[in-house]
């Protein structure tokens, strides 16, 4: 049976490096796995007042359904002010509510942070992991995926350097091993 990996990209920018990286990770999934990109840019900010039957935003219902249908999760995000972008944090909140109905629990996760700077989104990576611990999303610990200096790893046509793709493949292979230990 094919396993489905949901990919959430924290950057909303059309020509985002994060989207390029996420697409490459999706391509590297082995046979028996497929990916789906889960849209977060249309989610109204979480507000508990909207959690009444008949008032729940349609985008929240769609998002929760899509996350609920996947077996594992890839989070690919930039770093904003040493944390994750508001759109991604909002997606985590929307998926975790109403209390007791979280769609996140038990789905193996991979955190990839992409940055033009040298630290490769270290702050966002760890801020996201902290939220994922609370949401019961076990995450791959090694190798860590900090993709720094991204502008030097992608050419003008959007092709990612071979050595970087090899690193992505190593990460993907380790994630699949991790996933298979957790999901039977």
Label the model's feature ranges.
Residues 18, 22, 60, 88, ...:
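A general structural signal for well-ordered alpha-helical segments in protein cores
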Residues 2-32:
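N-terminal beta1-alpha1 ligand-phosphate binding loop
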Residues 138-184:
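Glycine-rich phosphate/pyrophosphate-binding loop and the adjoining helix
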Residues 8-10, 38, 112:
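Short hydrophobic segments within beta-strands
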Residues 55-136:
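Helix-loop-strand module that forms the ligand-binding subsite of alpha/beta enzymes
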Residues 30-36, 138:
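A generic structural motif
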Residues 40-57:
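N-terminal beta-loop-helix "entrance" segment that forms/cooperates
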């Amino acid at each position: 049976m094919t396993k489905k990996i949901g990919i959430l990209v924290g950057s909303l920018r059309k020509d985002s490096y994060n989207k390029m990286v996420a697409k490459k990770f999706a391509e590297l999934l082995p046979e028996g796995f497929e990916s789906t990109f889960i849209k977060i840019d249309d989610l109204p900010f979480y507000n508990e007042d909207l959690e009444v039957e008949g008032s729940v935003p349609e985008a929240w219902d769609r998002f929760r359904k899509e996350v609920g249908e996947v077996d594992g999760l890839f989070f690919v995000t930039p770093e904003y002010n040493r944390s994750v972008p508001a759109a991604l944090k909002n997606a985590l909140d929307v998926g975790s509510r109403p209390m007791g109905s979280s769609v996140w629990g038990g789905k193996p996760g991979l955190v990839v942070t992409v940055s033009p700077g040298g630290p490769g989104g270290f702050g966002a990576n760890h801020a996201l992991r902290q939220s994922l611990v609370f949401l019961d999303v076990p995450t791959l610990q090694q190798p860590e995926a900090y993709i720094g200096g991204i502008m030097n790893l992608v050419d003008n046509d959007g092709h990612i350097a071979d050595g970087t793709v090899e690193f992505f493949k190593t990460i993907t292979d380790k994630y699949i091993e991790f996933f298979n230990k957790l999901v039977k």
